[in-house]
């Protein structure tokens, strides 16, 4: 297992170097070494590295780790292999918040769009929690159904906003944001979401033992001393903080939170707290790879969700086939 973690870590580092190097303005490995060594480098190269490529690469790693960890956690606590970061309405709420900001504030105000996305995702999860509380049920299926309801409401409002939006500016901005991109990443945006991301990630890692036990039935969890209600609420709060901060900068990224946990389980042949960590690492590699392909496959940069979907579908098909053989 240490060798496997070392191999995945090496793959992430290689992908990170490639991510820094590729683009319209080429940066070589020697340039990267010179910058880190404090040697003399062309001003344009240094500026592109520090203000564009490095923040973008770090943001891609953060997004992959966050979505992978959140997807793994959701699949465990909801006991649903199809659970992903949008299962409880985070993605739908963030999308709605961004759409409202685009229509009401400005299509060019990235701060307003990012803020709208974050608070929209947070509000969606609060609505899910209130809906679950109103039903007086704490079963995992209730959380999933509440998330579906909130997502449906969010999509309906977004469709209405699109119908009345300016087709040349607002509609195009909404569609582009929904497909996800790292092209708008800056150092200031990265630093602004880093504390929220770290709080969410560290919180989940501290609870990983309780999360692992939650793969058992509720009665078994209680017998083992797991306090289901507070632990589940804490996990949802931490994951919302983490995923919401990511989506607020990158827009929606499809499939990453779904395929990373499945790939991690296929690699480790188990489903425990170690899988949560591996899911984050796999997610980082997948998103980094998708971002690299988004920049090199076409003259114009492709939306990130197109690439994560292209990468994710074959993995899910393979998972479906292997599950079918196991149950046959």
Region locations from a protein language model:
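Alpha-helical transmembrane segments in inner-membrane proteins
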Residues: 1-328
């Amino acid at each position: 297992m240490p060798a496997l973690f070392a191999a995945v870590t090496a793959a992430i580092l290689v992908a990170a170097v490639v991510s820094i190097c590729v683009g319209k303005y080429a940066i070589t490995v020697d340039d990267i070494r010179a910058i880190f060594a404090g040697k003399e480098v062309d001003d344009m190269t240094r500026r592109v590295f520090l203000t564009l490529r490095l923040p973008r690469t770090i943001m891609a790693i953060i997004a992959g780790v966050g979505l992978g960890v959140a997807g793994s956690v959701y699949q465990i606590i909801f006991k649903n292999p199809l659970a992903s970061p949008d299962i409880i309405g985070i993605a739908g709420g963030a999308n709605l918040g961004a759409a409202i900001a685009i229509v009401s504030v400005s299509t060019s105000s990235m701060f307003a769009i990012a803020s709208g996305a974050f608070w929209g995702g947070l509000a969606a999860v609060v609505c899910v929690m209130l809906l679950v509380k109103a039903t007086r049920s704490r079963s995992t299926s209730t959380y999933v159904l509440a998330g579906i309801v909130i997502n449906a409401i969010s999509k309906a409002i977004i469709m209405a906003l699109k119908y009345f939006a300016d087709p040349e500016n607002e509609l195009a901005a909404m569609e582009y944001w929904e497909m996800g991109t790292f092209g708008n990443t800056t150092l200031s945006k990265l630093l602004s979401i880093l504390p929220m991301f770290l709080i969410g990630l560290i919180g989940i890692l501290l609870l990983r033992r309780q999360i692992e036990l939650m793969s058992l039935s509720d009665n078994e969890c209680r017998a083992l001393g797991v306090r289901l209600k507070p632990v589940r609420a804490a996990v949802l709060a931490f994951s919302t903080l983490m995923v919401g901060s990511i989506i607020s900068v990158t827009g929606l990224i499809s499939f990453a939170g779904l395929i990373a946990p499945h790939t991690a389980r296929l690699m480790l042949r188990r489903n425990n707290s170690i899988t949560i960590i591996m899911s984050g690492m796999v997610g980082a590699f997948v998103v980094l790879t998708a971002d690299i392909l988004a920049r090199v496959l076409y003259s114009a940069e492709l939306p990130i969700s197109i690439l994560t979907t292209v990468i994710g579908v074959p993995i899910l098909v393979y998972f479906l086939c292997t599950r079918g053989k196991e149950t046959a």
